[in-house]
Amino acid sequence: MSMSDPIADLLTRIRNAQMVSKATVSVPSSKVKVAIAQVLKDEGYIDGFEVKSESGKTELEITLKYYAGRPVIERIERVSRPGLRVYKGCGSIPQVMNGLGVAIVTTPKGVMTDRKARATGVGGEVLCYVA
C-alpha cells in the first residue's frame, strides 16, 4: 500500500522517537526527505543523518539530538499537505515563534528555511514548522 503523505510520516516518526528518547530513527528515503534532514541538521535540530541502502531499498537514518535529557525539537508539524497545499510568496512566508523556530519551505531553488527564502527572494510551498 502506498503512503499518501511521506513527509508527514517522516515528521511523525521523528516526533514519536523523541517522545520515547530513541537515539536514532529510520525512515524510507527520498530526495525531499534528505533535503529536510539537511535543513534540520544545519539548524541544529538533529545531530546528523545517513542514507543507507539495503537490498534495493534506501533508508534515511536520522540521529536525534537531546539537551539535558529533553528533545531539542519541541514542536514539529506539517503545514502543506496533499489535501491542502500551502504556497507563500517571499514576503508572506510566516515566522515561527517570532523567529525562534523555522519554517521549512520548498522553492524552485531547493528546500530551505524561511529566513533563507526571504533573503533569497523566493517563495514556495511551506512544508512544516519546527520549534
From Swiss-Prot:
Signal peptide: none annotated. Gene3D superfamilies: 3.30.1370.30, 3.30.1490.10. It comes from the Bacteria. Disulfide bonds: none annotated. SUPFAM superfamilies: Ribosomal protein S8 (SSF56047). Keywords: Ribonucleoprotein, Ribosomal protein, RNA-binding, rRNA-binding. GO terms for biological process: translation. The keyword Ribonucleoprotein applies. One of its GO terms (molecular function) is structural constituent of ribosome. The keyword Chaperone does not apply. PROSITE patterns: RIBOSOMAL_S8. GO terms for cellular component: ribonucleoprotein complex; ribosome. Belongs to the universal ribosomal protein uS8 family. One of the primary rRNA binding proteins, it binds directly to 16S rRNA central domain where it helps coordinate assembly of the platform of the 30S subunit. PANTHER family: 40S RIBOSOMAL PROTEIN S15A. Part of the 30S ribosomal subunit. Contacts proteins S5 and S12. This is Small ribosomal subunit protein uS8.
